[in-house]
Amino acid sequence: SKFLIELFSSDAMKNDGAVLLFRTKSANFDNLKKLTPGDNIRVSVTVLPATFVKGPPEHKVRLQGANELLKLGYQISMNIDPIILTTDTVKTYKKIIDDIKTYFDYSSERFHRITIGMLRFGSKNLDNNIRKRHVDLYRHTKTSKMVKIPGDEKHRYDRELRVELYKSLVE
């Protein structure tokens, strides 16, 4: 990261409009804390409920780490992706949104954006990878309201369901 931050912090890169984006599910930001970020250096942190993520730290820990980076001058984005439909989806993801408000200074001018996305798979991924590596998720795709979108070749929740969920999350 040091090499990349130094490279992207150069005047030439800044003048060209180059942006360096680190995407992570980690809360270990020790290497970034030692460096001085330029205005074009962003860190994008994925925050998901522990129910669906095995391995990465709890989302509150990631939010706190991201907040520390924000205070050090990094631009921060949040990703809530993928949203997986369950009986408690709205409650679960509204809790994450509330935790962003609690553990992260989203009013900072260094806060870049929040992106939200639903679970989706390319047909090849579904058959070749997901079925073998994530049996429960594969079963979910077969028993939920996921459909293959013509022309897109991706399995997604149907549009009406996605729009309904997005609306309920922003209310």
Residue ranges and their predicted role:
Residues 1-7, 55-65, 91-101, 158-170:
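Well-ordered, non-membrane alpha-helical segments in soluble/globular domains
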Residues 1-62, 75-79, 111-117:
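Core AdoMet radical
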Residues 30, 53, 84-86, 139:
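Generic, ordered loop/turn and secondary-structure boundary motif
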Residues 10-16, 65-76, 106-110, 160-171:
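A structural motif corresponding to the C-terminal end of an alpha-helix
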Residues 98-171:
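Auxiliary Fe-S-binding modules of radical SAM enzymes
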